[in-house]
Amino acid sequence: MADESNTTGVVSPSTRAWLVGLLALLSVICYWVMVSIALNPKLTLVYDVKGARYGGPLVWPSRLLHLAGISAEARMQIFLWLIIVLNAMWLVAIYLVRKDRRKSISIIIAGAFAVFCLLFVFGPMFQSRDVFSYIFFGRSMTVYHANPFLLIPHARPHDIIYPLVGWKFNASVYGPVFNYPSYLITKIAGNDITLNILGFKLLAFISYAACLPIVYWLAKRVSPGRENMALVIAGWSPIMVMHLLGGGHNDALMVALLLGGYLLYRKGWLLSGIAVVMVASMVKIVAVLAVAPMLVMYVRDKQGAPLKRLWKATVVVVGVPVLLYLPFLKSLKIFKTTEHMSTLYSSASIPRLVSYQYQKILRGSGMTAIKAQSVANTRVHLLFLAIFAVVTIILLLSVKDYRSMALAASGIFLVWFVTSSYVLPWYLVMGLMLTAFTGWNFTTGAMLGASVIFSFYRIPEPPGHAVGGPNVWMSVPLILISLVWLVFEGAKRLTAWRAARAGVTAAEALDVALPGD
């Protein structure tokens, strides 16, 4: 295969390498300034540990540019422009390396990612308190010898981590697999809050870093020539850099296991791959969505009887969660918090916007506000659940080979994000990682668009700027992206169906014209 980096284009290979290097350098500078601003505890860009002080290289931009005393309005403007510039450079980098498979480009991408890690891993919690909940769930086991699925933080108000926890009345909503690293980290860190935070951030960093070679390897086989494009999508995404590295979210561990399962499946270890993805779903349950296309592909495989293969897959899909939950399964109450979370609405979700407008109509017809909210939320939940089910079935019907399996999985994650009532920026990680190695397609474009929009999810606002109701700046653009994606995907599938029908008709006509003996 010819080296696509030398194909004729506007930019020569050497110039392209220099441009990618320049984008890497500028991205590092932007993230450095962002982290430096965030270290000022008065600016509320991060969730800090009381009394913590930061120094060294992390604070240099703040001192050099005199950012410590900036106003709240200036903080918002700087942060906004940093996000805009970082997303623009990310998209330009994707375009530049889309057909460039040179190792030198891979090294530049990986080197920049390493610097991003240094900037965020050793800083405070960036725009999220989730790690403080992780610490409490670990301490539930190591300190209180309790079940993290049953013990809520409010039951231990004198615990050292309690003042920092955001969800004080919620037990763990994560799977049993996450309990083990949580136990290990909190056991080692003890009562040292900073060490606990660093432990979970290092777990996120190691997991995130492990994803990149897997994405590169899969891209090399699924979409040859697009390896570096996959690498820059996965490694330079502002959402993933800020929230996986800065926020230390366990989504990194989940997606690392998920990609590991897809890697095993691609290598021919089919049931093992399905089992590992089920383990990923025992970190966060949403990863189970990636199993559906694998099951369709596994059952459709012509090796062996379909029913026998379906039975084997069912044993794995049911057996793995049962075995992993057994040590914690004292009663079905362990799922109470997860059930509660499934009814919540976040401001940026599309269902939140629809429910909000529907409530206005119901209140206008004379219904009380409380009843209108209950009725609207229930009906909107059912509506979007039906939309998710229909589109998912259509996507699963398209699974015919490994690439279409990965595309279906990334499409399902996109539809889940669009139809879910509670969404946060880092929920896009699964879809981004999967679509990264499938090359350029409509789903890749939609995932990139959604991630750019949701990188603006938490712009630090000056006092008095916050407003209630749905976040239309997030949900309306997401609706537009979803509609465009549905139109293009629908047109593509309709064209393919017509072509298949035409092929069948032509084959039937040929059989009539040339009958067999």
Residue ranges and their predicted role:
Residues 1-32, 63-119, 400-401, 405-407, ...:
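Start-transfer (signal-anchor) and selected internal transmembrane alpha helices
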Residues 86-93, 212, 221, 320-322, ...:
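Aromatic/glycine/proline-enriched transmembrane-helix motif characteristic
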Residues 103-201, 205:
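Intramembrane catalytic core of multi-pass membrane enzymes that act on lipidic substrates
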Residues 113-117, 203-206, 218, 222, ...:
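Membrane-embedded helix bundles of polyisoprenyl
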Residues 128, 228-262, 283, 289-292, ...:
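Membrane-water interface signatures at transmembrane helix termini and the short loops
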Residues 178, 182-189, 200-214, 254-257, ...:
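Transmembrane alpha-helices of multi-pass, membrane-embedded glycan-processing enzymes
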Residues 289-319:
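Perimembrane helix-loop-helix junctions
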Residues 439-517:
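Aromatic-enriched
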